[in-house]
């Protein structure tokens, strides 16, 4: 037996319920638009940011008006123990420079010290600056030294052979040791710069005991660590 009118009524009721459901989910044009929560704008805290107070042209160390043709740069910078003097490396001119920042807003150049070789890094321990200097004649025969400079007088007081090309230097917190990375950099023109290329790099540890002339070096091999 067929009930066509009942079937039509059921279909109409189902369609009506579906439309009600869609209307409830989608919302009508009269519904209020959602609003984002109000967030107060933050106020920058100047004490938590780097704020430039001055600049210093390192070229002024070789010419008051930077008129000299001598190329200079400031690559690595360290501060004296009292924080009043900056020491920077200038590999292009083979020098280290000194800047007085007793008044940070008005830095004063104190001159530069010329070295035999390229300074690659500098660190400070006590009254001295420890300068890593690359003296290599070639990639296959790397050499270097640690030059010890008295900061106040800006004079060299000692040298220590490093037996390879140094890249960077750091001093332990207690001031008893200096660690020098002996890079012995590779020749990028050989085999596309691929490694291995000998001699291998290593770590040099300098025992800072006694006067600078009495400091000694210990080497730490870094080969075979991937095995």
Language model features: what each stretch is:
Residues 43-227:
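Mobile, glycine-rich extracellular loop/lid and propeptide segments
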């Amino acid at each position: 037996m067929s009930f066509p009118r009942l079937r039509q009524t059921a279909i109409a009721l189902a369609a009506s319920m579906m439309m009600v459901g869609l209307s409830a989910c989608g919302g009508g044009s009269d519904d209020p638009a959602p609003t984002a929560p109000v967030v107060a704008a933050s106020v920058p805290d100047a004490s938590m940011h780097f704020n430039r107070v001055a600049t210093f042209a390192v070229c002024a160390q070789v010419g008051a008006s930077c008129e000299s043709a001598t190329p200079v740069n400031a690559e690595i910078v360290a501060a004296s123990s009292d924080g009043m003097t900056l020491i920077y490396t200038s590999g292009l001119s083979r020098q280290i420079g000194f800047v007085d920042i007793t008044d940070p807003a008005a830095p004063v150049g104190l001159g530069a010290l010329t070295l035999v070789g390229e300074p690659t890094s500098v660190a400070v321990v006590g009254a001295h600056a420890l300068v890593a200097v690359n003296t290599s004649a070639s990639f296959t025969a790397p050499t270097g030294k640690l030059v010890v400079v008295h900061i106040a007088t800006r004079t060299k007081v000692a040298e220590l052979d490093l037996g390879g090309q140094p890249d960077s230097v750091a001093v332990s917190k207690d001031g008893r040791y200096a660690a020098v990375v002996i890079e012995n950099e590779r020749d990028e023109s050989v085999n596309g710069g691929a490694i291995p290329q000998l001699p291998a790099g290593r770590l040099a540890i300098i025992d800072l005991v006694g006067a600078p002339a009495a400091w000694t070096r210990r080497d730490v091999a870094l080969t075979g660590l991937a095995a």
